[in-house]
Curated annotation (Swiss-Prot):
HAMAP family in UniProt: GTPase_Der
Family membership: Belongs to the TRAFAC class TrmE-Era-EngA-EngB-Septin-like GTPase superfamily. EngA (Der) GTPase family.
Binding-site residues for GTP 2, renumbered to this chain: 190-197, 237-241, 302-305
SUPFAM superfamilies per record: P-loop containing nucleoside triphosphate hydrolases
Protein name per UniProt: GTPase Der
Quaternary structure and partners: Associates with the 50S ribosomal subunit.
GO terms for biological process, alphabetical: ribosome biogenesis
Residue ranges of domain KH-like in the record: 359-443
Annotated Gene3D superfamilies: 3.30.300.20, P-loop containing nucleotide triphosphate hydrolases
Described purpose of this protein according to its UniProt entry: GTPase that plays an essential role in the late steps of ribosome biogenesis.
InterPro entries in alphabetical order: G_ENGA, GTP-bd, GTPase_Der, KH_dom-like, KH_dom-like_a/b, P-loop_NTPase, Small_GTP-bd
The keyword Ribosomal protein appears for this protein: no
Pfam assignment, any one: KH_dom-like
Length: 465
């Protein structure tokens, strides 16, 4: 599981601006599933190297019907899921009935809430904050998200402690220990109704997950340990148990949060795609999130049975066009979860991807491969600078991290970095896992001696004078 920060508040108070500050990016994950609130944003953030998820829940209003009511339900689910809630208000506009409506929702939850008084640039902070204490929360803090004023202080004061406590407690939980014991931990991700639960049942060989043919009815994710051919696994079906009723009110959006958390907790991610619908932007968002988190990856193109040869060729062309960045290393399987076709091959790829992600490489081997790559294709000259790669070593596993030391490595072009990745991948036969390269500038061992000599010469010249 991941620590979750929910940003809530009425419309136009600066929630998205605060979201961008926390995630340090405008590349939010935006999902548009059927039955899902539009333009919801999910992002990753870090504080002192501790990762957490951020969700911008959209504006809550006190309207009783229609889209606003649905938005309010979405935001209430965000509150339920969150470890910390940033309740954003507008310091210029002052306290409104909309703020009071949101505060009333929050008071019904036993959550850690910080009232973030935004847009205080040009306004005296204490006076801007004063009236918001009327909302009944003891933690009130003023920021200007647009100018990043006090935003770091906000995190230092209110995020640091609960985030550190979360990570400390999580590593001690039984859930974490069970996850470590049950072999390869993999998750099935994908849009609603692509067949994740059917594939779960096929993999387990029994109907452990109740499935109805209704998109948008996700309630929770299900984690199940099992064994197959003597190998231990834990499977997470992010679709989980489905129910018939309340399709419009069911908050499928928050299966997205569970999906993102499942990706982060997994050793291997199986992305399930409906062959008849093809690859969507949502599929690409989930796949990119998995790669960004360094997860090993397998693709399962489901509902392949019953398609004409012409349609199959069109699907393959579409996959090649949209997933060109994966074709060198990710296994793609065309399956029928319902009939079991090729599901066994998915297991083979899961095993291979996991083994590659955790492959042991010595410093000698890493350096030797780097030298072979340089001999075959030297780093380019960058202006008057000659880039020299000296040695390499492994910096981590799952994903594999290769650390390369050298001179002028900060000038190494991306094209050469891609060349190194492809060279290492082919030489080590890495399938299914991304490889992370880190480049570190080698320190000049004579720099201190040179600086000392210059300092000494300076001292002598002063004495001479």
């Amino acid at each position: 599981m991941s620590f979750l920060v929910a940003i809530v508040g009425r419309a136009n108070v600066g929630k998205s601006t605060l979201f961008n500050v926390l995630t340090n990016s405008r590349d939010a994950l935006v999902f548009d599933f059927e039955g899902v609130t539009r333009d919801r944003q999910y992002g990753q953030a870090k504080y002192d190297d501790l990762g957490y998820l951020v969700v911008d829940t959209g504006g809550i209003s006190d309207q009783d019907a229609g889209f606003d009511e649905f938005m309010a339900k979405q935001s209430q689910m965000a509150i339920d899921e969150a470890n910390l809630v940033f309740f954003v208000v507008d310091g210029r506009s002052g306290l409104t009935s909309g703020d009071e409506y949101v505060a009333n929702l929050l008071r019904q939850k036993d959550k850690r809430v910080v009232v973030v008084v935004n847009k205080v640039d040009g306004v005296e902070e204490e006076s801007a904050m004063a009236e918001f204490y009327e909302l009944g929360f003891d933690k009130v803090f003023a920021v200007s998200a647009a100018h990043r004023r006090n935003t770091q202080k906000l995190l230092d004061k209110f995020l640091k402690k609960p985030l550190n406590e979360f990570y400390r407690d999580y590593t001690q939980t039984q859930e974490h220990k069970e996850q470590q014991r049950h072999g390869i931990h993999f998750s099935l991700i994908g849009r609603p109704n692509v067949g994740k639960s059917t594939l779960t049942n096929r993999m387990l060989g029994e109907d452990r997950v109740v499935v109805f043919d209704m998109p948008g009815t996700t309630i929770d994710s299900v984690s199940i340990p099992f064994e197959r051919h003597g190998h231990k696994y834990t499977i997470v079906d992010t679709a989980g148990v489905r129910r018939r009723g309340k399709v419009k009110q069911t908050l499928e959006k928050f299966s997205v949060i569970k999906t993102l958390q499942a990706i982060q907790d997994s050793n291997v991610v199986v992305a399930v795609v409906d062959a008849r619908e093809g690859i969507s932007d949502q599929d690409l968002s989930l796949i990119h999130f998995a790669i960004k988190n360094g997860r090993a990856l397998v693709l399962a193109i489901n509902k392949w049975d019953g398609m004409t040869e012409e349609d199959r060729n069109l699907v393959k062309q579409d996959l090649k066009r949209k997933l060109f960045f994966l074709e060198d290393y990710v296994d793609v399987h065309f399956i029928s979860a319902l009939h079991g076709t090729n599901v066994g091959h998915v297991f083979e790829s899961i095993d291979t991807a996991y083994a590659c992600a955790n492959k042991k490489i010595t410093t000698a081997d890493a350096t030797r491969l780097m030298q072979l790559a340089v001999e075959a294709h030297s780093p380019p000259m960058v202006g008057k600078f000659r880039i020299k790669l000296k040695y390499a070593h492994v910096g981590g596993h799952n994903p594999p991290v290769i650390v390369i030391h050298g001179n002028q490595v900060n000038r190494l072009p991306n094209s050469y970095k891609r060349y190194l990745e492809n060279f290492f991948r082919e030489a080590l036969d890495f399938r299914g896992t991304p490889i992370v390269f880190e480049f570190k500038q080698s320190e000049n061992p004579f720099a201190d001696r040179k600086n000392k000599r210059i300092k000494d010469e300076g001292s002598k010249s002063k004495k001479t004078k």
